[in-house]
Amino acid sequence: LPEEIAVPRAWSVTFYLLAVIFVLLFLYHQFILPKPKNDVPVKNGNPLNAFFQTFITFFQKKGIIAALAFILLFRFAESQLVKIASPFLLDNPEIGGLGLSTMQVGTIYGVVGLIALTIGGILGGILMAKNGLKHWIWWMTAAMNLPNLVYVYLAFTHPSNIWLISSAVAIEQFGYGFGFTALTYFMMLFSKGPL
């Protein structure tokens, strides 16, 4: 199939498969999964009041401004990179890109990148469980940001070797997965319990 047809078709097939999986999971949870006898809804009065009380309590926490700044800025560089990385990989070399096809970029991010991201996240979780956030925060911050330099390398060298480009994306995604663990763990710790 031509790439103009193959890409939309691949997305359609992906979402149809996801829809089937979700319907099967719904049916399993609705009809097959055992339900304990004491599984009854709990009523806490006015649900709207409880909803707003949760927000009020959260924003009264000590250090909320610093925590929100950390949450919003921790992956700031990565959020900027992710918007420009795909166009950089897709654009023609004449205008500064690497000239990859949509299928190549999809494979690099969807297979190589996802595997590296998952491994980085799992490793980050294991190390965080051993030594805690305080020990790993600077290492994970560096892991989140320093691998972005692979795109500087790619921009200067314009390699055509798909393995080199895939390795660079894998390094960046591994660092993102490893570093993102710190942000996730921080949000879990900060949001736990009242004040």
Model-based region annotation:
Residues 187-195:
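Paired intracellular helix-loop junctions of major facilitator superfamily
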Residues 1-80, 129:
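Intracellular loop-helix junctions on the cytosolic face of multi-pass helical membrane proteins
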Residues 13-17, 105, 136:
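Alpha-helical transmembrane segments of multi-pass secondary-active solute transporters
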Residues 118-138:
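Helix-to-loop junctions at the C-terminal end of transmembrane segments
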